[in-house]
Structures are given as C-alpha cells and as structure tokens.
Amino acid sequence: TQHAFYRDFCLATRHCEDGHRDICLAFPMALPQNTDRIVGFEECGRARLDGQDSYKGMAEGSNTDEGLWIASPARTPLAEAKHIYWFGSAYDAMAFYQLHRAQNQELRKAVFISTGGDLTEKQMRGVLEQTIPARQHICFDNDHTGSVLARSLQKEIYRTIREAIEVTPERKPYLDSIPDGDDLDGGEFYLLP
C-alpha cells in the first residue's frame, strides 16, 4: 500500500520555537482541474498543542474549500477514471485499498479522493464535472457525520447528472418536476415524454 501511494503522502516536520520538532503524515491536496498544483495538506498523527492525543486535520493555509487528496496507484488521470472512491480521510482510503486490492485488481486504476473530513460544493463539483461517466463509490464513515457527507455527495451527483441532460421541449416538464437533489426517477412520471 505504501508503494502504491508513495507519490501521494510524505512526512511533514514543524519546527517549534522551543527546538522541538513535530512530525506527521501529510497528504498533498490538489485542485481537481489541476492535480499537479498542491494547495494544502491533510495531516494525520501530529501531536496536539494541548498535549492530548494526536491531531488529524488540515495544515495551516490549506485550501479546504476546493482542495482534495486525489490519488491513483496507476496514476489514472481524474477525467479518465472509471471508478472514483470518496473518503473522509486519505488514511481511510489507503486502508480500504490495502483491504480490497487482492480481490479487486481494478483498484489500481481507480482514483481515490479524500475530503479531509469536510465536504464543500466546490470540491464535489470540481470532481464530478470531470468524472460524470465514472462510477462514484461513497465510502465515508458509518457515523452521523459520514451519513451527512454521503447524502450531500449523493445529491450533488444527482444535480450534476441532471444538468448534463439536454433539455428538449419534450423533456422539460419532467425534468422541471424533479426536486433539487433528487435522482432522475424523482419527477412526476405522468410528465414523461
């Protein structure tokens, strides 16, 4: 797993004023439209300032509004991916890959996305606009926050697909009857052409 993702994580060191150094695992975040440009880091394992447990979050100055960890063991470009796997953390994505790679050889070609724990419309739109034909796999944690993130992503997937459909005079009444964020089958069936 480390070899599969070796380009997609690093160790980050923060030098403190007292001479102490904090080292953590860092996952570079990029913009979906420009995956070569690093716009921040998702961090895991840094000591908290209050001395309690370890910290998981974003490095100071990270573009958390648009940036995501975007990784593919086979270096599959986002726009060419057939499978997109969405996670709340890069660490979870790598663990998923490690658990399932033997049974699913296609995972090497998949693109793994980490939102860093939060999910914004710009993050979702940035990925979905490039990956409409790809299968989107929602892999957030099975807790309340994960459920909220999954529902938000599901609604954005529906919106993106809906916006990609050509609106013809015959289709317009039905398409207009679909509630915002609902699947294509959410409209009034009697309005179908």
Predicted regions and their residues:
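Glycine-/acidic-rich phosphate or pyrophosphate-binding loops and their flanking alpha/beta elements
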Residues: 53-81
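Short active-site oxyanion
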Residues: 80-84, 135-136
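Helix N-cap/beta->alpha junction signal
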Residues: 88-89
